[in-house]
Amino acid sequence: MWAPEEDYKQPLLTNSRVANNGNNNNSNGRGGSSSPSTRLQPEHSSRKCNDILFTILFLLVIGGMAAISGIAYTKGDPSRLVPNAPNIPSIPGFNTNTTSSENPIEQYFVSHLESLVAELKRDKDILIYSVLLAIALGAAWIQLLKSFTRFFIYFTLCVGVALVATLGGLFMALGHKEGSESTMIVGGCIIICTLVLVVVIVYLRKSIDLTCAMFTETCRGVQRSPSVFVIASLVVLFFIGFIAYWTSSFIYLFSIPGSTVNPLNDHTSSEANSTDSEQEQSAFNTKIRNLMYFMIFGFFWASSFISAVFQHCVAGVVSNWYFSRDPTGKSLVGQENAYRSLGRALSTSFGSLAFGSLLIAFIEFMAFMLRVCKNSNATNKLVVMVVSCLQCILGCIESIVRWINKFGYIYVAMHGHSFCTSTKECFDLISRNMFNAVIMDFIGGLVLLLGKILGSAASALFTTALLYGMGKSLNPITIALSAIFAFCIFNLFTHIVGIGTDTIFVCYLEDLETNKDGNLYISPDLHELLQDKCNECKEKEQKNQSKV
Protein backbone atom coordinates (compact mmCIF):
# COMPACT_ATOMS: atom_id res chain seq x y z
CA MET A 1 0.00 0.00 0.00
CA TRP A 2 2.89 2.34 0.80
CA ALA A 3 6.43 2.43 -0.51
CA PRO A 4 9.36 2.14 1.94
CA GLU A 5 9.76 5.36 3.84
CA GLU A 6 12.95 7.39 3.66
CA ASP A 7 12.42 8.84 7.11
CA TYR A 8 13.31 5.50 8.69
CA LYS A 9 16.94 6.16 7.80
CA GLN A 10 17.29 8.97 10.31
CA PRO A 11 19.19 8.05 13.50
CA LEU A 12 17.04 7.63 16.57
CA LEU A 13 19.46 9.31 18.95
CA THR A 14 22.73 11.12 18.29
CA ASN A 15 25.97 9.60 19.50
CA SER A 16 26.72 12.60 21.69
CA ARG A 17 23.48 12.19 23.55
CA VAL A 18 24.11 8.50 24.02
CA ALA A 19 27.60 9.16 25.25
CA ASN A 20 26.38 11.71 27.77
CA ASN A 21 23.61 9.50 29.08
CA GLY A 22 25.43 6.19 28.81
CA ASN A 23 27.52 6.98 31.90
CA ASN A 24 24.37 7.36 33.97
CA ASN A 25 23.32 3.75 33.39
CA ASN A 26 24.16 1.18 36.00
CA SER A 27 23.51 -2.46 36.54
CA ASN A 28 20.42 -1.81 38.67
CA GLY A 29 17.00 -2.00 37.04
CA ARG A 30 15.59 -4.16 34.40
CA GLY A 31 17.78 -3.17 31.53
CA GLY A 32 21.19 -3.01 33.14
CA SER A 33 23.89 -0.92 31.45
CA SER A 34 23.84 -0.17 27.77
CA SER A 35 26.51 1.03 25.42
CA PRO A 36 26.04 3.27 22.41
CA SER A 37 26.17 0.24 20.14
CA THR A 38 23.92 -1.97 22.25
CA ARG A 39 20.25 -1.53 22.87
CA LEU A 40 18.40 -3.88 25.16
CA GLN A 41 14.90 -5.12 24.50
CA PRO A 42 12.37 -5.69 27.29
CA GLU A 43 12.40 -9.08 28.92
CA HIS A 44 10.00 -11.47 27.22
CA SER A 45 8.71 -14.59 28.87
CA SER A 46 8.27 -17.74 26.83
CA ARG A 47 4.80 -17.44 25.40
CA LYS A 48 2.39 -20.03 26.70
CA CYS A 49 -1.35 -20.38 26.99
CA ASN A 50 -2.61 -18.29 29.90
CA ASP A 51 -6.01 -18.05 31.58
CA ILE A 52 -7.01 -21.45 30.22
CA LEU A 53 -10.10 -21.52 32.45
CA PHE A 54 -11.58 -18.56 30.62
CA THR A 55 -10.71 -20.15 27.29
CA ILE A 56 -12.80 -23.17 28.27
CA LEU A 57 -15.64 -20.99 29.57
CA PHE A 58 -15.71 -18.92 26.39
CA LEU A 59 -15.75 -22.00 24.16
CA LEU A 60 -18.55 -23.48 26.27
CA VAL A 61 -20.60 -20.30 25.87
CA ILE A 62 -20.04 -20.33 22.11
CA GLY A 63 -21.04 -23.99 22.02
CA GLY A 64 -24.15 -23.22 24.06
CA MET A 65 -25.10 -20.45 21.64
CA ALA A 66 -24.68 -22.86 18.73
CA ALA A 67 -26.90 -25.44 20.46
CA ILE A 68 -29.58 -22.84 21.16
CA SER A 69 -29.40 -21.68 17.56
CA GLY A 70 -29.94 -25.25 16.41
CA ILE A 71 -33.04 -25.52 18.59
CA ALA A 72 -34.29 -22.14 17.37
CA TYR A 73 -33.79 -22.96 13.69
CA THR A 74 -35.55 -26.30 14.18
CA LYS A 75 -38.58 -25.13 16.16
CA GLY A 76 -38.82 -21.44 15.28
CA ASP A 77 -41.31 -19.94 12.84
CA PRO A 78 -40.50 -16.31 11.94
CA SER A 79 -43.72 -16.03 9.90
CA ARG A 80 -45.57 -15.81 13.21
CA LEU A 81 -43.95 -12.43 13.81
CA VAL A 82 -45.37 -10.96 10.59
CA PRO A 83 -48.48 -8.83 11.25
CA ASN A 84 -51.79 -10.25 9.99
CA ALA A 85 -50.26 -13.69 9.53
CA PRO A 86 -52.93 -16.40 9.64
CA ASN A 87 -51.32 -18.34 12.49
CA ILE A 88 -50.58 -15.40 14.79
CA PRO A 89 -52.97 -15.17 17.76
CA SER A 90 -55.32 -12.25 17.88
CA ILE A 91 -54.92 -9.68 20.61
CA PRO A 92 -58.07 -8.69 22.50
CA GLY A 93 -59.14 -5.15 21.73
CA PHE A 94 -57.31 -4.96 18.39
CA ASN A 95 -58.65 -5.76 14.95
CA THR A 96 -55.89 -7.78 13.27
CA ASN A 97 -57.83 -8.13 10.01
CA THR A 98 -57.39 -4.48 9.07
CA THR A 99 -55.43 -4.14 5.86
CA SER A 100 -53.02 -1.41 5.01
CA SER A 101 -55.38 -0.04 2.38
CA GLU A 102 -57.83 0.93 5.13
CA ASN A 103 -55.19 3.07 6.83
CA PRO A 104 -54.20 6.01 4.58
CA ILE A 105 -51.29 7.08 6.81
CA GLU A 106 -49.75 3.61 6.76
CA GLN A 107 -50.37 3.35 3.03
CA TYR A 108 -48.57 6.68 2.46
CA PHE A 109 -45.51 5.65 4.44
CA VAL A 110 -45.34 2.22 2.78
CA SER A 111 -45.55 3.69 -0.71
CA HIS A 112 -42.97 6.38 0.15
CA LEU A 113 -40.61 3.75 1.56
CA GLU A 114 -41.01 1.60 -1.54
CA SER A 115 -40.07 4.52 -3.78
CA LEU A 116 -36.99 5.28 -1.66
CA VAL A 117 -35.88 1.65 -1.80
CA ALA A 118 -36.37 1.62 -5.58
CA GLU A 119 -34.19 4.73 -5.90
CA LEU A 120 -31.61 3.10 -3.64
CA LYS A 121 -31.41 0.09 -5.95
CA ARG A 122 -30.95 2.41 -8.89
CA ASP A 123 -28.14 4.28 -7.09
CA LYS A 124 -26.21 1.20 -5.94
CA ASP A 125 -23.31 2.02 -8.28
CA ILE A 126 -22.95 5.45 -6.70
CA LEU A 127 -22.84 3.83 -3.25
CA ILE A 128 -20.03 1.57 -4.41
CA TYR A 129 -18.10 4.58 -5.72
CA SER A 130 -18.60 6.41 -2.42
CA VAL A 131 -17.27 3.41 -0.46
CA LEU A 132 -14.18 3.22 -2.68
CA LEU A 133 -13.68 6.95 -2.23
CA ALA A 134 -13.92 6.59 1.55
CA ILE A 135 -11.25 3.87 1.51
CA ALA A 136 -8.97 6.03 -0.63
CA LEU A 137 -9.56 9.04 1.62
CA GLY A 138 -8.76 6.96 4.70
CA ALA A 139 -5.44 5.79 3.23
CA ALA A 140 -4.63 9.34 2.12
CA TRP A 141 -5.57 10.65 5.57
CA ILE A 142 -3.02 8.38 7.26
CA GLN A 143 -0.33 9.35 4.74
CA LEU A 144 -1.03 13.04 5.28
CA LEU A 145 -1.09 12.50 9.02
CA LYS A 146 2.44 11.06 8.85
CA SER A 147 4.00 13.42 6.31
CA PHE A 148 2.38 16.70 7.37
CA THR A 149 1.37 15.91 10.92
CA ARG A 150 1.49 19.37 12.46
CA PHE A 151 -0.17 21.12 9.51
CA PHE A 152 -2.77 18.41 9.12
CA ILE A 153 -3.72 18.36 12.80
CA TYR A 154 -4.03 22.14 12.95
CA PHE A 155 -5.95 22.08 9.67
CA THR A 156 -8.29 19.40 11.03
CA LEU A 157 -8.90 21.37 14.20
CA CYS A 158 -9.55 24.63 12.33
CA VAL A 159 -11.87 23.01 9.80
CA GLY A 160 -13.75 21.21 12.55
CA VAL A 161 -14.26 24.42 14.50
CA ALA A 162 -15.30 26.24 11.32
CA LEU A 163 -17.85 23.54 10.46
CA VAL A 164 -19.38 23.64 13.93
CA ALA A 165 -19.52 27.44 13.87
CA THR A 166 -21.09 27.39 10.38
CA LEU A 167 -23.70 24.91 11.56
CA GLY A 168 -24.57 27.16 14.49
CA GLY A 169 -24.82 30.17 12.18
CA LEU A 170 -27.13 28.27 9.81
CA PHE A 171 -29.43 27.33 12.67
CA MET A 172 -29.49 30.93 13.87
CA ALA A 173 -30.26 32.25 10.37
CA LEU A 174 -32.93 29.61 9.78
CA GLY A 175 -34.55 30.33 13.13
CA HIS A 176 -34.52 34.08 12.47
CA LYS A 177 -36.05 33.57 9.02
CA GLU A 178 -38.83 31.26 10.20
CA GLY A 179 -39.33 33.03 13.52
CA SER A 180 -38.62 29.84 15.46
CA GLU A 181 -37.17 30.45 18.91
CA SER A 182 -36.32 26.79 19.46
CA THR A 183 -34.18 26.71 16.30
CA MET A 184 -32.38 29.88 17.39
CA ILE A 185 -31.75 28.37 20.82
CA VAL A 186 -30.20 25.29 19.19
CA GLY A 187 -28.00 27.56 17.06
CA GLY A 188 -26.94 29.54 20.11
CA CYS A 189 -26.03 26.35 21.97
CA ILE A 190 -23.92 25.20 19.02
CA ILE A 191 -22.09 28.55 18.90
CA ILE A 192 -21.43 28.35 22.65
CA CYS A 193 -20.04 24.83 22.16
CA THR A 194 -17.80 26.24 19.42
CA LEU A 195 -16.41 28.85 21.81
CA VAL A 196 -15.80 26.18 24.45
CA LEU A 197 -14.02 24.07 21.84
CA VAL A 198 -11.76 26.99 20.91
CA VAL A 199 -10.90 27.59 24.58
CA VAL A 200 -10.03 23.90 25.04
CA ILE A 201 -7.79 23.90 21.97
CA VAL A 202 -5.98 27.05 23.13
CA TYR A 203 -5.50 25.57 26.60
CA LEU A 204 -4.07 22.34 25.16
CA ARG A 205 -1.88 24.01 22.53
CA LYS A 206 1.30 22.81 24.25
CA SER A 207 0.15 19.22 23.88
CA ILE A 208 -0.35 19.55 20.13
CA ASP A 209 3.37 19.11 19.44
CA LEU A 210 3.36 15.94 21.54
CA THR A 211 0.30 14.68 19.70
CA CYS A 212 1.96 15.39 16.35
CA ALA A 213 5.05 13.37 17.27
CA MET A 214 2.96 10.51 18.64
CA PHE A 215 0.84 10.31 15.50
CA THR A 216 3.92 10.43 13.28
CA GLU A 217 5.53 7.55 15.17
CA THR A 218 2.30 5.54 15.06
CA CYS A 219 1.81 6.03 11.33
CA ARG A 220 5.38 4.88 10.72
CA GLY A 221 4.71 1.64 12.54
CA VAL A 222 1.34 1.03 10.91
CA GLN A 223 2.61 1.73 7.41
CA ARG A 224 5.45 -0.75 7.84
CA SER A 225 2.81 -3.48 8.19
CA PRO A 226 -0.03 -2.62 5.80
CA SER A 227 -1.44 -6.11 6.35
CA VAL A 228 -2.87 -4.79 9.62
CA PHE A 229 -5.60 -3.16 7.52
CA VAL A 230 -6.34 -6.54 5.94
CA ILE A 231 -6.61 -8.14 9.37
CA ALA A 232 -8.81 -5.27 10.57
CA SER A 233 -11.10 -5.69 7.57
CA LEU A 234 -11.35 -9.43 8.19
CA VAL A 235 -12.21 -8.83 11.84
CA VAL A 236 -14.91 -6.34 10.86
CA LEU A 237 -16.37 -8.72 8.27
CA PHE A 238 -16.35 -11.54 10.82
CA PHE A 239 -18.12 -9.30 13.32
CA ILE A 240 -20.77 -8.38 10.72
CA GLY A 241 -21.28 -12.08 9.99
CA PHE A 242 -21.58 -12.81 13.70
CA ILE A 243 -24.22 -10.09 14.09
CA ALA A 244 -26.18 -11.56 11.16
CA TYR A 245 -25.99 -15.05 12.67
CA TRP A 246 -26.97 -13.88 16.14
CA THR A 247 -29.86 -11.76 14.86
CA SER A 248 -31.33 -14.61 12.83
CA SER A 249 -30.93 -17.02 15.75
CA PHE A 250 -32.62 -14.57 18.10
CA ILE A 251 -35.54 -14.06 15.70
CA TYR A 252 -36.06 -17.80 15.32
CA LEU A 253 -35.81 -18.27 19.08
CA PHE A 254 -38.33 -15.51 19.69
CA SER A 255 -40.74 -17.08 17.20
CA ILE A 256 -40.83 -20.58 18.69
CA PRO A 257 -44.53 -21.60 18.86
CA GLY A 258 -45.88 -21.11 22.34
CA SER A 259 -43.87 -18.00 23.20
CA THR A 260 -46.84 -15.68 22.72
CA VAL A 261 -45.68 -13.51 25.61
CA ASN A 262 -42.67 -11.25 25.25
CA PRO A 263 -39.87 -13.16 27.02
CA LEU A 264 -38.00 -9.92 27.78
CA ASN A 265 -40.98 -8.46 29.64
CA ASP A 266 -41.39 -9.52 33.24
CA HIS A 267 -45.01 -8.39 33.40
CA THR A 268 -46.24 -11.93 32.74
CA SER A 269 -48.48 -13.32 35.46
CA SER A 270 -51.03 -16.11 35.65
CA GLU A 271 -54.48 -16.23 37.13
CA ALA A 272 -55.04 -18.10 40.34
CA ASN A 273 -57.38 -20.55 38.64
CA SER A 274 -55.26 -21.21 35.55
CA THR A 275 -55.41 -24.55 33.81
CA ASP A 276 -52.56 -27.03 33.48
CA SER A 277 -52.01 -26.05 29.86
CA GLU A 278 -51.64 -22.40 30.83
CA GLN A 279 -49.11 -23.36 33.49
CA GLU A 280 -47.15 -25.37 30.95
CA GLN A 281 -47.32 -22.37 28.60
CA SER A 282 -45.94 -20.10 31.32
CA ALA A 283 -43.13 -22.57 32.07
CA PHE A 284 -42.31 -22.77 28.38
CA ASN A 285 -42.13 -19.00 28.16
CA THR A 286 -39.77 -18.96 31.14
CA LYS A 287 -37.44 -21.37 29.35
CA ILE A 288 -37.48 -19.23 26.22
CA ARG A 289 -36.74 -16.12 28.27
CA ASN A 290 -33.76 -17.78 29.97
CA LEU A 291 -32.39 -18.94 26.62
CA MET A 292 -32.72 -15.40 25.30
CA TYR A 293 -30.83 -14.03 28.27
CA PHE A 294 -28.07 -16.56 27.60
CA MET A 295 -27.93 -15.53 23.93
CA ILE A 296 -27.73 -11.85 24.89
CA PHE A 297 -24.90 -12.50 27.34
CA GLY A 298 -23.11 -14.57 24.70
CA PHE A 299 -23.48 -11.71 22.24
CA PHE A 300 -21.90 -9.24 24.67
CA TRP A 301 -19.01 -11.59 25.42
CA ALA A 302 -18.35 -12.56 21.80
CA SER A 303 -18.48 -8.96 20.55
CA SER A 304 -16.14 -7.80 23.33
CA PHE A 305 -13.78 -10.67 22.50
CA ILE A 306 -13.71 -9.73 18.81
CA SER A 307 -12.85 -6.15 19.80
CA ALA A 308 -10.09 -7.46 22.09
CA VAL A 309 -8.61 -9.53 19.24
CA PHE A 310 -8.57 -6.43 17.06
CA GLN A 311 -6.78 -4.37 19.73
CA HIS A 312 -4.30 -7.19 20.35
CA CYS A 313 -3.44 -7.41 16.64
CA VAL A 314 -2.77 -3.68 16.29
CA ALA A 315 -0.80 -3.51 19.55
CA GLY A 316 1.27 -6.54 18.56
CA VAL A 317 2.09 -5.05 15.17
CA VAL A 318 3.15 -1.66 16.54
CA SER A 319 5.13 -3.00 19.52
CA ASN A 320 6.96 -5.56 17.37
CA TRP A 321 7.90 -2.81 14.91
CA TYR A 322 9.01 -0.51 17.74
CA PHE A 323 11.48 -2.97 19.28
CA SER A 324 12.76 -4.46 16.01
CA ARG A 325 14.44 -1.32 14.63
CA ASP A 326 18.18 -1.05 14.20
CA PRO A 327 20.19 2.11 15.10
CA THR A 328 19.38 3.64 11.71
CA GLY A 329 15.64 3.29 12.29
CA LYS A 330 15.10 0.48 9.78
CA SER A 331 12.92 -2.46 10.74
CA LEU A 332 12.84 -5.97 9.36
CA VAL A 333 9.17 -6.51 10.10
CA GLY A 334 7.01 -7.03 7.06
CA GLN A 335 3.63 -8.23 5.93
CA GLU A 336 3.69 -11.30 8.19
CA ASN A 337 3.86 -9.13 11.32
CA ALA A 338 0.09 -8.66 11.50
CA TYR A 339 -0.63 -12.32 10.79
CA ARG A 340 1.70 -13.44 13.56
CA SER A 341 -0.02 -11.07 15.95
CA LEU A 342 -3.40 -12.50 14.97
CA GLY A 343 -2.06 -16.01 15.46
CA ARG A 344 -0.90 -15.17 18.99
CA ALA A 345 -4.29 -13.62 19.77
CA LEU A 346 -6.06 -16.83 18.76
CA SER A 347 -3.61 -19.16 20.49
CA THR A 348 -1.46 -18.20 23.48
CA SER A 349 -3.37 -15.00 24.34
CA PHE A 350 -6.84 -16.45 23.73
CA GLY A 351 -7.65 -16.96 27.41
CA SER A 352 -6.32 -13.55 28.45
CA LEU A 353 -8.46 -11.79 25.86
CA ALA A 354 -11.45 -13.90 26.89
CA PHE A 355 -10.92 -12.88 30.52
CA GLY A 356 -10.72 -9.18 29.74
CA SER A 357 -13.74 -9.30 27.44
CA LEU A 358 -15.70 -11.23 30.08
CA LEU A 359 -15.43 -8.24 32.44
CA ILE A 360 -16.90 -5.94 29.79
CA ALA A 361 -19.60 -8.47 28.88
CA PHE A 362 -20.69 -8.87 32.50
CA ILE A 363 -21.02 -5.11 32.95
CA GLU A 364 -22.93 -4.75 29.68
CA PHE A 365 -25.27 -7.59 30.63
CA MET A 366 -25.96 -5.99 34.01
CA ALA A 367 -26.75 -2.72 32.22
CA PHE A 368 -29.15 -4.61 29.95
CA MET A 369 -30.90 -6.20 32.93
CA LEU A 370 -31.26 -2.77 34.50
CA ARG A 371 -32.93 -1.52 31.31
CA VAL A 372 -35.32 -4.48 31.40
CA CYS A 373 -36.11 -3.74 35.05
CA LYS A 374 -36.67 -0.07 34.25
CA ASN A 375 -39.06 -0.88 31.41
CA SER A 376 -40.93 -3.43 33.52
CA ASN A 377 -41.48 -0.88 36.31
CA ALA A 378 -42.02 2.21 34.19
CA THR A 379 -44.99 3.29 36.32
CA ASN A 380 -43.02 3.15 39.58
CA LYS A 381 -41.08 6.42 39.76
CA LEU A 382 -38.99 5.34 42.75
CA VAL A 383 -37.76 2.21 40.99
CA VAL A 384 -37.07 4.20 37.82
CA MET A 385 -35.01 6.74 39.79
CA VAL A 386 -32.97 4.07 41.60
CA VAL A 387 -32.35 2.11 38.41
CA SER A 388 -31.30 5.29 36.58
CA CYS A 389 -28.72 6.00 39.30
CA LEU A 390 -27.43 2.43 39.06
CA GLN A 391 -27.18 2.78 35.29
CA CYS A 392 -25.10 5.94 35.69
CA ILE A 393 -22.75 4.24 38.17
CA LEU A 394 -22.46 1.17 35.97
CA GLY A 395 -21.68 3.34 32.95
CA CYS A 396 -18.79 4.98 34.83
CA ILE A 397 -17.48 1.57 35.90
CA GLU A 398 -17.68 0.34 32.32
CA SER A 399 -15.66 3.31 31.05
CA ILE A 400 -12.95 2.69 33.66
CA VAL A 401 -12.79 -1.04 32.93
CA ARG A 402 -12.55 -0.39 29.18
CA TRP A 403 -9.68 2.03 29.79
CA ILE A 404 -7.89 -0.53 31.98
CA ASN A 405 -8.50 -3.33 29.50
CA LYS A 406 -6.99 -1.26 26.70
CA PHE A 407 -3.59 -1.15 28.38
CA GLY A 408 -3.94 -4.73 29.58
CA TYR A 409 -4.41 -5.92 25.99
CA ILE A 410 -1.38 -3.90 24.89
CA TYR A 411 0.85 -5.53 27.50
CA VAL A 412 -0.56 -8.97 26.67
CA ALA A 413 0.38 -8.38 23.03
CA MET A 414 3.88 -7.22 24.02
CA HIS A 415 4.83 -9.92 26.54
CA GLY A 416 2.26 -12.71 26.39
CA HIS A 417 1.56 -12.63 30.12
CA SER A 418 -1.81 -13.41 31.67
CA PHE A 419 -4.41 -10.66 31.73
CA CYS A 420 -4.12 -9.81 35.43
CA THR A 421 -0.32 -9.85 35.35
CA SER A 422 -0.22 -7.71 32.21
CA THR A 423 -2.65 -5.14 33.60
CA LYS A 424 -0.78 -4.88 36.90
CA GLU A 425 2.67 -4.57 35.30
CA CYS A 426 1.46 -2.05 32.74
CA PHE A 427 0.04 0.29 35.35
CA ASP A 428 3.06 -0.21 37.58
CA LEU A 429 5.14 0.87 34.61
CA ILE A 430 3.04 3.99 34.07
CA SER A 431 3.03 4.97 37.74
CA ARG A 432 6.78 4.44 38.15
CA ASN A 433 7.51 6.81 35.30
CA MET A 434 5.06 9.50 36.46
CA PHE A 435 3.36 9.60 33.07
CA ASN A 436 -0.22 8.79 34.02
CA ALA A 437 -1.20 12.47 33.67
CA VAL A 438 0.16 12.63 30.12
CA ILE A 439 -2.54 10.34 28.75
CA MET A 440 -5.28 12.71 29.84
CA ASP A 441 -3.53 15.60 28.07
CA PHE A 442 -3.64 14.06 24.64
CA ILE A 443 -6.00 15.70 22.23
CA GLY A 444 -5.64 12.88 19.78
CA GLY A 445 -9.17 11.70 20.43
CA LEU A 446 -10.55 15.03 19.27
CA VAL A 447 -8.42 14.97 16.13
CA LEU A 448 -9.51 11.42 15.29
CA LEU A 449 -13.16 12.30 15.85
CA LEU A 450 -12.92 15.34 13.59
CA GLY A 451 -11.18 13.18 11.00
CA LYS A 452 -14.14 10.79 10.98
CA ILE A 453 -16.58 13.68 10.65
CA LEU A 454 -14.60 15.20 7.78
CA GLY A 455 -14.44 11.85 5.99
CA SER A 456 -18.18 11.35 6.34
CA ALA A 457 -18.91 14.88 5.13
CA ALA A 458 -16.59 14.48 2.13
CA SER A 459 -18.26 11.22 1.13
CA ALA A 460 -21.74 12.73 1.47
CA LEU A 461 -20.73 15.76 -0.61
CA PHE A 462 -19.23 13.49 -3.26
CA THR A 463 -22.42 11.43 -3.45
CA THR A 464 -24.56 14.56 -3.66
CA ALA A 465 -22.42 16.04 -6.43
CA LEU A 466 -22.45 12.76 -8.33
CA LEU A 467 -26.23 12.46 -8.12
CA TYR A 468 -26.66 16.07 -9.18
CA GLY A 469 -24.17 15.77 -12.03
CA MET A 470 -25.85 12.64 -13.39
CA GLY A 471 -29.25 14.32 -13.30
CA LYS A 472 -30.69 11.94 -10.71
CA SER A 473 -32.94 12.83 -7.82
CA LEU A 474 -31.19 13.49 -4.51
CA ASN A 475 -32.19 10.39 -2.57
CA PRO A 476 -31.61 11.15 1.14
CA ILE A 477 -31.17 7.47 1.95
CA THR A 478 -28.35 7.14 -0.60
CA ILE A 479 -26.57 10.21 0.77
CA ALA A 480 -27.06 9.07 4.37
CA LEU A 481 -25.77 5.56 3.63
CA SER A 482 -22.68 6.95 1.91
CA ALA A 483 -21.95 9.09 4.97
CA ILE A 484 -22.52 6.11 7.31
CA PHE A 485 -20.24 3.84 5.27
CA ALA A 486 -17.55 6.52 5.21
CA PHE A 487 -17.86 7.03 8.97
CA CYS A 488 -17.44 3.29 9.58
CA ILE A 489 -14.40 3.11 7.27
CA PHE A 490 -12.77 6.16 8.87
CA ASN A 491 -13.61 4.76 12.28
CA LEU A 492 -11.59 1.67 11.37
CA PHE A 493 -8.59 3.76 10.30
CA THR A 494 -8.75 6.08 13.30
CA HIS A 495 -9.23 3.17 15.69
CA ILE A 496 -6.01 1.62 14.41
CA VAL A 497 -4.16 4.92 14.86
CA GLY A 498 -5.63 5.39 18.35
CA ILE A 499 -4.59 1.93 19.55
CA GLY A 500 -1.18 2.38 17.92
CA THR A 501 -0.66 5.68 19.74
CA ASP A 502 -1.40 4.07 23.12
CA THR A 503 0.95 1.21 22.22
CA ILE A 504 3.76 3.63 21.31
CA PHE A 505 3.26 5.31 24.68
CA VAL A 506 3.59 2.02 26.60
CA CYS A 507 6.54 0.91 24.44
CA TYR A 508 8.33 4.17 25.19
CA LEU A 509 7.95 3.64 28.93
CA GLU A 510 9.25 0.09 28.59
CA ASP A 511 12.10 1.34 26.42
CA LEU A 512 12.99 4.04 28.94
CA GLU A 513 13.13 1.59 31.84
CA THR A 514 15.13 -0.96 29.88
CA ASN A 515 17.73 1.34 28.31
CA LYS A 516 17.77 4.05 31.00
CA ASP A 517 17.48 7.06 28.69
CA GLY A 518 20.43 5.95 26.60
CA ASN A 519 20.36 4.65 23.01
CA LEU A 520 16.58 4.38 22.99
CA TYR A 521 14.51 2.88 20.20
CA ILE A 522 12.20 5.87 20.02
CA SER A 523 12.75 8.78 17.66
CA PRO A 524 14.54 11.74 19.27
CA ASP A 525 11.81 14.32 18.66
CA LEU A 526 9.18 12.32 20.50
CA HIS A 527 11.63 11.47 23.30
CA GLU A 528 12.39 15.15 23.90
CA LEU A 529 8.70 16.06 23.95
CA LEU A 530 7.83 13.27 26.37
CA GLN A 531 10.70 14.23 28.65
CA ASP A 532 9.55 17.87 28.63
CA LYS A 533 6.03 16.76 29.45
CA CYS A 534 7.32 14.62 32.28
CA ASN A 535 9.25 17.57 33.71
CA GLU A 536 6.11 19.73 33.54
CA CYS A 537 4.16 17.11 35.47
CA LYS A 538 6.88 16.88 38.11
CA GLU A 539 6.99 20.68 38.49
CA LYS A 540 3.21 20.81 38.94
CA GLU A 541 3.42 18.09 41.58
CA GLN A 542 6.16 19.92 43.47
CA LYS A 543 4.16 23.17 43.39
CA ASN A 544 1.06 21.41 44.70
CA GLN A 545 3.04 19.76 47.49
CA SER A 546 4.65 23.08 48.46
CA LYS A 547 1.22 24.73 48.65
CA VAL A 548 -0.05 21.97 50.93
Curated annotation (Swiss-Prot):
The organism's superkingdom is given as: Eukaryota
Q: Which GO terms describe its cellular component?
A: membrane
Its keywords, alphabetically, are: Glycoprotein, Membrane, Transmembrane, Transmembrane helix
Its primary localisation, in coarse terms, equals membrane
| Segments traversing the membrane | 52-72, 125-145, 151-171, 184-204, 226-246, 290-310, 350-370, 381-401, 442-462, 479-499
Annotated GO MF terms: transmembrane transporter activity
A GO BP entry: transmembrane transport
The UniProt entry's coiled-coil ranges are none
Region listing for Disordered, in residue ranges: 1-44
Q: Which Pfam families would you find in this protein's record? A: Choline_transpo (PF04515)
Localization: Membrane
What is the name attached to this protein's record?
CTL-like protein DDB_G0288717
